[in-house]
Amino acid sequence: MLFILAVIALLITFILVPILIPTLKRMKFGQSIREEGPQSHMKKTGTPTMGGLTFLISIIITSIIAIFFVDNSNPIILLLFVTIGFGLIGFIDDYIIVVKKNNQGLTSKQKFLAQIAIAVVFFLLSDVFHLVEFSTNLNIPFTNISIPLSFAYVIFIVFWQVGFSNAVNLTDGLDGLATGLSIIGFTMYAIMSFVLDSPAIGAFCIIMIFALLGFLPYNLNPAKVFMGDTGSLALGGIFATISIMLNQELSLLLIGLVFVIETASVMLQVASYKLTKKRIFKMSPIHHHFELSGWGEWKVVTVFWTAGLISGLIGLWIGVH
């Protein structure tokens, strides 16, 4: 059944993207590029965005099919809720930017409050209504230490889901970068899920992998379409949710290490400039620093993919031991 789900997810995305691209162009749903960014990116102005709709539709359709064939499919239902919730926030943000011609999109406060609402509902569905059972203890790898958080765990969930949804969003600045890293990350979690006897989560990860594989050829440099906030916010929220449901939260710090580094580079850059009026990097997120240092876009992407693969394998090893 997993093979059938994988094929369905792959085909839906692969078929939808070439249909959506001319539609987005006709509707003038093109990406605007920051003038202060690398000059090589200016040629990307007008590239269709909101392409994340294609793999989100694929994930939703294929997951609904999976619910009827996978034993104990409650985890898939919960992951679908997170997918739709964070995807909807991203879609509204993209819509305001592209259609309303407001480059700010949703305000930080609006986006943050919406993300918090989804995280809280996720906690209620899982812990209070017992849609899915998981521990509210935070396990420390390689130790017998388990920190009981009880209802404070909802604060952790908010921090984790909001943090990683925005981390993937920050990383999605080069053609294929976030898509490739996500494929690597979900592959690690697919393996971990089956090893830890969580086949429903594993099935969802398989769906994620193949839905993204259908999108990747169109997103590689030179990208024919960008996933937009529609895709990136959803991917980050899903990563955080899977790590929570497997009770392997801290594994995401390694499986999603590149996302963490990208986010840290932005935070350090902002803090440094506010405190010293000096910048640590030529530009943040850090992938732009390497571009401005003379690296080609494809080189940055492949090096970051490699780093993500290595750290992901380490995170997988820690997660299953």
Curated annotation (Swiss-Prot):
Keywords attached to this entry: Cell cycle, Cell division, Cell membrane, Cell shape, Cell wall biogenesis/degradation, Magnesium, Membrane, Metal-binding, Peptidoglycan synthesis, Transferase, Transmembrane, Transmembrane helix
Identify the cofactor(s): Mg(2+)
* Entry's Gene Ontology cellular component terms: plasma membrane
Question: What residue intervals traverse the membrane?
Answer: 1-21, 50-70, 76-96, 112-132, 140-160, 176-196, 200-220, 225-245, 250-270, 300-320
Q: How does it sit in the membrane?
A: Multi-pass membrane protein
Group of enzyme by EC: transferase
Q: Name one GO molecular function term.
A: phospho-N-acetylmuramoyl-pentapeptide-transferase activity
Q: Name one Pfam family in it.
A: Glycos_transf_4
- Single Gene Ontology BP annotation: cell division
Under catalytic activity, the entry for this protein gives: UDP-N-acetyl-alpha-D-muramoyl-L-alanyl-gamma-D-glutamyl-L-lysyl-D-alanyl-D-alanine + di-trans,octa-cis-undecaprenyl phosphate = Mur2Ac(oyl-L-Ala-gamma-D-Glu-L-Lys-D-Ala-D-Ala)-di-trans,octa-cis-undecaprenyl diphosphate + UMP
InterPro entries, per the entry = Glycosyl_transferase_4, PNAcMuramoyl-5peptid_Trfase, PNAcMuramoyl-5peptid_Trfase_CS
Protein localization: Cell membrane
What pathway does the annotation place this protein in?
Cell wall biogenesis; peptidoglycan biosynthesis
- Write down the EC number: 2.7.8.13
The job of this chain, per UniProt, is described as:
Catalyzes the initial step of the lipid cycle reactions in the biosynthesis of the cell wall peptidoglycan: transfers peptidoglycan precursor phospho-MurNAc-pentapeptide from UDP-MurNAc-pentapeptide onto the lipid carrier undecaprenyl phosphate, yielding undecaprenyl-pyrophosphoryl-MurNAc-pentapeptide, known as lipid I.
Under PANTHER family, the record lists: PHOSPHO-N-ACETYLMURAMOYL-PENTAPEPTIDE-TRANSFERASE, PHOSPHO-N-ACETYLMURAMOYL-PENTAPEPTIDE-TRANSFERASE HOMOLOG
UniProt similarity note: Belongs to the glycosyltransferase 4 family. MraY subfamily.
Q: What is this protein called?
A: Phospho-N-acetylmuramoyl-pentapeptide-transferase
Q: Which organism is it from?
A: Staphylococcus haemolyticus (strain JCSC1435)
